[in-house]
């Protein structure tokens, strides 16, 4: 069995590191699929992304909606999904595509300023910095604590009913970005207010249906946002005070957001 989670998941940065994005998120994935065919892997579980839905549809996004990516990161995920379908039809590689979205929790990378909004805020609050929000904060997401994903991902490789299926995986309660930021500030007890930055190219309202994941993967949303962020904050306070990762040189500077300019 192969679980393919590896990716550089900085979706917002992907338009400015296009080659790096495709080398890491597409080419390496197709190499792994080729090896899986060659060595008769019994199941290939691919962690895709809700980003493949783009901004064409009104949420919640369901698995039967046609992919409509709006950035190179989502294009790479979509291409891998298509390659898996071909590998199944032509070579018999059994696969399951899981489209997780907005998972967070302990051991998450909080030192990368380009991805994982809750981790970004957590780093800022640990360092007594105001949390930053792109745009007006009215964007909507549904967050899930990482522990809630463990059993569903295991079942994705174990159940025959999951072969050849695409399954959303993620939270059942939506939050605006402003609300999520305030929940974290309250959890930390910090007397800091968010700072709003220029809006960026993104899908503003994005969350998915979850019924199929309950039926096929036994998904249960057990940890609410406040409880999950409390656990993550206690973990984060024990971590070393590391420098944040800064991308050394963008492949494309045209249109880069002021906040990311080196």
Which residue ranges define each predicted feature?
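Short beta-strand segments
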Residues: 45-48, 97-105, 135, 166-171
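The catalytic Tyr-centered alpha-helix of NAD(P)H-dependent dehydrogenases
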Residues: 69-76, 100, 110, 114-118, ...
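N-terminal Rossmann-like NAD(P)+-binding domain of SDR-like oxidoreductases, especially those catalyzing
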Residues: 1-101, 239, 245, 250, ...
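Short, glycine/charged-enriched secondary-structure capping and boundary segments
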Residues: 16-20, 58-62, 111-114, 146-148, ...
